Amino acid sequence: MLMPANFSSLVGEFMSSTIPKYCVTIVKNRYHNGHPDLIPAGMFPDDAIQHVPHGIEIKASRYLRSWQGHNPEDVWLMVFVFDSNRPKDETPRPFRFVKVVGAELSKDDWLFSGRSETSRRTITASVTDSGYQKMMANWIYRGSGFE
């Protein structure tokens, strides 16, 4: 069984791998843990770059807001919000996307959470209300009942 965070990662990786099949001007960044996930095709050797401001970062989440990344930075962000069963659910329901939003966010659209010196958790930054408003103003897909 997958941990819930791993399932979100799997959905995000699926979208990062699938979108370039239908949009030949972008490719999945081939650099291990490179940022962003999608970069302009042919711009970098072997379509691999550790960090660059060009491209789109992809996230998948079961939450309608409060999305997180690892660093507050200027980035195009695309979030695929989905609905699916959780491990405790007894009655199965089909996986579905409920909304897809994307926008260019600035460092000011993130709130850095950091961590204490004794913490082992991964550092995170959360999309602020200003970032959320940008994302919602530039919606790509909205399923019925999830506006």
Language model regions located:
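Nucleic-acid endonuclease domains
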Residues: 1-35, 39-55, 60-147
